[in-house]
Swiss-Prot record:
This is SH3 domain-binding protein 5. It comes from Rattus norvegicus. It is found in: Cytoplasmic vesicle membrane; Mitochondrion. InterPro entries: SH3BP5. One of its GO terms (biological process) is intracellular signal transduction. Functions as a guanine nucleotide exchange factor (GEF) with specificity for RAB11A and RAB25. Inhibits the auto- and transphosphorylation activity of BTK. Plays a negative regulatory role in BTK-related cytoplasmic signaling in B-cells. May be involved in BCR-induced apoptotic cell death. Residues 1-68, 308-347, 371-427 are annotated as: Disordered. Belongs to the SH3BP5 family.
Length: 457
């Protein structure tokens, strides 16, 4: 029983702690994402071509380096062999090698002069043949022109003769130059041969004794020259293979940069709005339709102006109605003459601090219409309205003073400029309200005087 329990416990999967499990799940998710990206993205066909070039260049470089190393090793081995054998032979021959060196040097110079003279002779012969062929062409052209009975000398014939003449002149110049070079080389060759014969007669015994040494030296010299030429060719081929390898690497690097840039742009996605611009996006088309919301001060000032003007209009209407009841004049207010001065509309109110609409209502109580008073045309009603206006003016001045005190207290002792500006604004507001109340009282006095005049009349 115990063994069965142990076996069942051992077969149960071991639960990992939460951090280890999360890390393992994260790694598995990253691996799946990488595999998915690799499967989704197709391999750029340019990569395959550049990789083939890179592999081919690598093989060429390895092969050329091996061949170059073998050629250099062979050159060094031949050089060592020639040095050892020539030293042994020089020791065997003795002093005759040093004595016969001038002769062999003169012989080498004569051989070089002979080769130059042969080359100059070939150039001279070639120039002579070209000159002869050009002269024959001109003679044949002239002969055909003379044999023709019509003798039509057209532009094509003239152009052919011009080319033939030009070739003759060039051939003559080439022949002259080659002739001069041939003479110079022939002179050097004759001088070298004369010196060689002179030394041969003088050093005949030493020359015969050291001849095996210099013949072996010439043999190794020719062999070393051939090996040196092979090494130079292999070095040029190796440099070419390295250039191809470098070009393939640059191409692969450029393709890799393009792929990484494309992946980065795809991962970033389209560019969105800046920080803080998510909730306040307003299109250009909706700009004309959007209107700024009025603040509390502007709403209060507009309400105050509308109520004052409404009160003035209602008072004018009531007075007009009372006048029309006592007189037989015009029955509509529009037919009455303009006897009352126009009341100036107050401008926008500039308060020293933000004031809500309810506070503004407390500061400036709005008078009700004149019709609400019991005695519309009685002097008691006029006195009551005057008391209301005076009370409203007193409350307004008290409220403005309180606002000035509050604003000056909140500003602190270090803001003298803000306090002075606040007090000036409060004084300007008080002066403006006094002017408005005076204008309203003047309008009422004029209306009362007109009513009394009508009643007396």
């Amino acid at each position: 029983m115990d063994t069965a329990l142990k076996r069942s416990r051992s077969e149960e999967p071991v639960e990992l702690p939460p951090p280890a499990r999360e890390a393992e799940e994260k790694e598995e998710e990253e691996e799946r994402m990488e595999q998915g990206l690799e499967e989704e993205e197709e391999v750029d066909p340019r990569i395959q071509g550049e990789l083939e070039k890179l592999n081919q260049s690598t093989d060429d470089i390895n092969r050329r380096e091996t061949e170059l190393e073998d050629a250099r090793q062979k050159f060094r081995s031949v050089l060592v062999e020639a040095t050892v054998k020539l030293d042994e032979l020089a020791k065997k021959i003795g002093k005759a090698v040093e004595d016969s060196k001038p002769y062999w040097e003169a012989r080498r110079v004569a051989r070089q002069a002979q080769l130059e003279a042969q080359k100059a002779t070939q150039d001279f012969q070639r120039a002579t043949e070209v000159l002869r062929a050009a002269k024959e062409t001109i003679s044949l052209a002239e002969q055909r022109l003379l044999e023709d009975d019509k003798r039509q000398f057209d532009s094509a014939w003239q152009e052919m003769l011009n080319h033939a003449t030009q070739r003759v002149m060039e051939a003559e110049q080439t022949k002259t130059r080659s002739e001069l070079v041939h003479k110079e080389t022939a002179a050097r060759y004759n001088a070298a041969m004369g010196r060689m014969r002179q030394l041969e007669k003088k050093l005949k015994r030493a020359i015969n004794k050291s001849k095996p040494y210099f013949e072996l030296k010439a043999k190794y010299y020719v062999q070393l020259e051939q090996l040196k030429k092979t090494v130079d060719d292999l070095q040029a081929k190796l440099a070419l293979a390295k250039g191809e390898y470098k070009a393939a690497l640059k191409s692969l690097e450029r393709i890799s940069d393009e792929i990484h840039e494309r992946r980065r742009s795809n991962a970033m996605g389209p560019r969105g709005c800046g920080v803080g611009a998510e909730g306040s996006i307003t299109s250009v088309e909706n700009l004309p339709a959007s209107k700024p919301e009025p603040d509390a001060i502007s709403v209060a000032s507009e309400a105050f102006e509308d109520d004052n003007c409404g009160n003035l209009v209602s008072e004018d209407d009531s007075e007009t109605q009372s006048v029309s009841s006592f007189s037989s004049g015009p029955t509509s207010p529009s037919e009455m003459p303009d006897q009352f001065p126009a009341v100036a509309r107050p401008g926008s109110l500039d308060l020293p601090s933000p004031v809500s609409l309810s506070e503004f209502g407390m500061m400036f109580p709005i008078l009700g219409p004149r019709s609400e008073c019991s005695g519309a045309s009685s002097p008691e009603c006029e006195v009551e309205r005057g008391d209301r206006a005076e009370g409203a003016e007193n409350k307004m001045s008290d409220k403005a003073n309180n606002n000035r005190v509050l604003s000056s207290t909140s500003a602190g002792g270090g803001r003298s400029r803000s306090q002075s500006s606040t007090s000036l604004e409060g004084q300007a507001l008080e002066t403006r309200m006094k002017q408005l109340s005076l204008q309203c009282s003047k309008g009422r006095e004029g209306i009362i005087a007109d009513i009394k005049t009508v009643q007396i009349g």
